Design a protein with these regions (language model features):
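Short terminal alpha-helical segments
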Residues: 1-27
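Cystatin/cathelin-like cysteine-protease inhibitor module
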Residues: 2-4, 32, 77-81
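Residue-level signal for secondary-structure boundary elements
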Residues: 17-25, 55, 59, 83
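Short, charged, low-complexity loops and linkers
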Residues: 27-34
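Acidic, low-complexity, intrinsically disordered interaction modules
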Residues: 36-57, 61
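Charged low-complexity stretches with an acidic bias
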Residues: 56-84
Length: 84
């Protein structure tokens, strides 16, 4: 994965975690959902969106299959940050 994009994803992850109150308000709108799963899903969704957007914005192309696999590894390597 391009190092610039990896750095942006780390910033996005830290920003999203710091927006915890907003995420909790969003989750509170739904009944009978597992908080941790929903919280993780929101964070992964934000990162996924940012991953594709930044590739198009910075590199002017879609990420390759290998870069997407590296993104998945990025998520796996940072899972402990997703826990609430």
């Amino acid at each position: 994965m391009d190092e610039r994009i990896k750095e942006i994803l780390l910033e996005k992850l830290n920003f999203s975690i710091n927006q915890d109150g907003e995420i909790q308000k969003l989750i509170a709108c739904f009944e009978n959902v597992d908080f941790n799963s929903f919280y993780t899903g929101i964070l992964v969704g934000r990162l996924y969106n940012s991953f594709f957007y930044q590739y198009r914005r910075i590199l002017k192309r879609n990420p390759s299959n290998m870069e997407f696999k590296e993104f998945v590894d990025f998520i796996k390597n940072n899972l402990k940050m997703f826990s609430k």
